[in-house]
């Protein structure tokens, strides 16, 4: 408890936001980059991996329209682009990958990128 306006006690509570599995994996990749002196803010070659028996053709079409290079065969799709991977820049991209996986009934297995130090 802390004193609020006019000396009245206030209870402060922080809303806890549970991290998704992908949020945790994203943070782990960024932590590995940070250990190597990479803040993630410089755009770099980044790959995203999708697996499963869902609709890879539709994923490829949507991803190409969004500016990604796509490759893969059968039950594997890899999307490529050049982007920054710091948390603020990357969060919307990560959310988009997760929504594409759900929409096309695929497993989004995460991402990797080049290390860039300046």
Language-model regions, residue ranges each:
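Long, contiguous binding/interaction regions
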Residues: 1-118
């Amino acid at each position: 408890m802390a004193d609020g306006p006019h000396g009245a006690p206030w209870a402060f509570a922080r809303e806890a936001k549970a991290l998704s599995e992908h949020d945790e994996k994203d943070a782990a990749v960024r932590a590995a980059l940070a250990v190597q002196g990479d803040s993630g803010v410089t755009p770099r070659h980044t790959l995203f991996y999708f697996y499963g028996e869902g609709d890879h053709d539709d994923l490829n079409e949507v991803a190409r329209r969004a500016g990604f290079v796509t490759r893969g065969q059968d039950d594997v799709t890899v999307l490529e682009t050049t982007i920054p991977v710091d948390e603020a820049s990357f969060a919307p991209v990560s959310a988009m990958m997760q929504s594409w996986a759900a929409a096309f009934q695929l497993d989004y297995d995460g991402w990797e990128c080049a290390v860039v130090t300046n």
